[in-house]
Amino acid sequence: MKIKINDYPTFNKEWDREKTEEKTDNMLKKIGKLQNKMFAQNKFSLLIILQGTDASGKDGVTKGLLKYCNPIGIKIYSFKKPTENEYAHDFLWRVHEVVPRKGDLQVFIRSHYEDILVPSVEKFIPAEIIDERFKLINDFEKLLENNDTKVLKFFMNVSKEAQKGRLMERIELKEKHWKHKDGDWDTREKFDEYLAVYEKIINTCNEIPWHIVPSDKNWQKLYFTAEIILKTLEEMDLKWPELISERFKSGK
């Protein structure tokens, strides 16, 4: 059954904010403990991919999710326009170079999906090359999972109205001026075109499923993503390493 992004809410009116935020904080504490165990075990890794339009809240949810995590085992990579050197390689070269090591929790703010998304809308790469990238990405993500890297993919589903409000804040609030880019407003004019490509990505690169996150409100977005990440970590075979010592015996 084809997934249609517009069938998914950007905001859930029935959620109680105070209760939701309390549940979220409890989940974040559990995520922190499990992430530390994963780092100590040094066997598995977790890759969290965050995609969404400009001002959908990818940076903010990253900050919230890692509140109680051990920073030593955390890596964050934000994908920008490819450099000249990156353009000289295949499109996955720059991605494979920064996937998580064993034990790490890695967050991709944007990802390899930008190499389908942007050229599809802006039309600077032939369609047949873009079509091939769908298969290559599916294969790449299977490779990661086959090597003990669990992959979670989130699409930050923000309404056009909420996006405009956040972009306006970057103009009006001094502490957010640094986030402003004129190009974000150019991209906004193609909001529906980008959404259509995202829909194709979600339906085609779906061997590892996508999670469509209601993102108009930061507290709802954080709850939704934390719940899935916690469930994933709980289902991984995470164990504290045994004591290695010739002098001491392991405690209970």
Where do the model's predicted regions map?
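Charged, amphipathic alpha-helical linker segments immediately N-terminal to NTP-binding catalytic cores
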Residues: 1-26
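Conserved nucleotide-sensing/catalytic segment adjacent to the nucleotide-binding pocket
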Residues: 14-22, 72-132
